Amino acid sequence: MPELPEVEVSRQGISPWLTGIKVTRVVVRDGRLRWPVPGEIQELVDLTIHRVSRRAKYLLLETDFGTAILHLGMSGSLRVLDIGTPAEKHDHVDIELANGKLLRLNDPRRFGALLWTREPAEAHALLAKLGPEPLTDAFNADYLRERAKGRSTAIKTFLMDNQVVVGVGNIYANEALYAAGIHPKRAAGNISAERLGTLVAEIKRVLAEAIRQGGTTLKDFTSADGKPGYFVQQLQVYGRGGQPCFHCHTLLSEIRLGQRTTVFCSHCQR
C-alpha cells in the first residue's frame, strides 16, 4: 500500500506537469473504485489546476472552483503520459491536459478513489478530522506527549491512528520505533517525554529519507515516471522477521499487532 512517502513522491512527480495547466477532458473508463467516481468530476474540465498538494495520503488537485481528491488505495499509481497513449488493464481514469499530457490512474485492486468537492478540501469529511502532518512543526514532542497522556494503547497502534498523526503507516512505524529503541507494544502513556522526543525525531527522519529515496517499492508502488522507490534497501526491520538485528544480531521478532505485521528487536527495543 502506498504510504505517505510514496504519495508525496507521486505529488512531486506530477505537480510540474499539472500546475498552471487547464484540464481539457476527463475520461472515466471504469468508475467502480472504493467509492464510485462521481459524475461531478466532469466539473474539472476547462478548469486550471493551480496547485497539487497532499493531505495525509490524499492528493489534492486544487482549482478556483473545487478540488479533485485522489487516493491511491492499496495498489493505485499515477503516471504522466502523452495524450493518445493506449490504455492498459486497470487504467481506470485519465485527466487530459492542455499541454498534451494526461494524468492516468491505474488501480488493479480498486481501493483507490477520485472524488470532487466544491467546498474547501480541508472541510471534506475524509480530511476534516485528520491529525497533523508528521513533517511539520505541529507534530512535535509536546504534542505527542499530550496526546499520549493516560493512553494504554500500544505505541505502534497509537502512531498509526490518523487522528493522532497522519501518514505513519506500517512500514515507517516499524522503522521509526526501531530507530528510537521503543518496543511497539509499550503503552503510549508509559513512555517518557525524552523518549517521545526521540521518537518524533526518528519519525521525521525516516519519512524524510524515504521521500528522498523515492519511497519504498514492495509490490505495487512506482513513482509518476514509472521508477521504483529505493528506501526498501534501507529497511532495518520491516520484512526482516526472523533475521538478525543489524545492531545486536538478536533474531528479530515478528508478531501481529492491531492486525498488522510488526517486526522488532527484543534486545534493542524496550
From Swiss-Prot:
Pfam families: Fapy_DNA_glyco, H2TH, zf-FPG_IleRS. It catalyses: Hydrolysis of DNA containing ring-opened 7-methylguanine residues, releasing 2,6-diamino-4-hydroxy-5-(N-methyl)formamidopyrimidine; 2'-deoxyribonucleotide-(2'-deoxyribose 5'-phosphate)-2'-deoxyribonucleotide-DNA = a 3'-end 2'-deoxyribonucleotide-(2,3-dehydro-2,3-deoxyribose 5'-phosphate)-DNA + a 5'-end 5'-phospho-2'-deoxyribonucleoside-DNA + H(+). Binds 1 zinc ion per subunit. The keyword Nuclease does not apply. The active site is at 2 (schiff-base intermediate with dna), 3 (proton donor), 57 (proton donor), 260 (proton donor). A zinc finger (FPG-type) spans 236-270. InterPro entries: DNA_glyclase/AP_lyase_DNA-bd, DNA_glyclase_Znf_dom_DNA_BS, Formamido-pyr_DNA_Glyclase, FPG_cat, MutM-like_N-ter, Ribosomal_uS13-like_H2TH, Znf_DNA_glyclase/AP_lyase, Znf_FPG/IleRS. The keyword Manganese does not apply. DNA binds at residues 90, 109, 151. Its EC number is 3.2.2.23, 4.2.99.18. This is Formamidopyrimidine-DNA glycosylase.
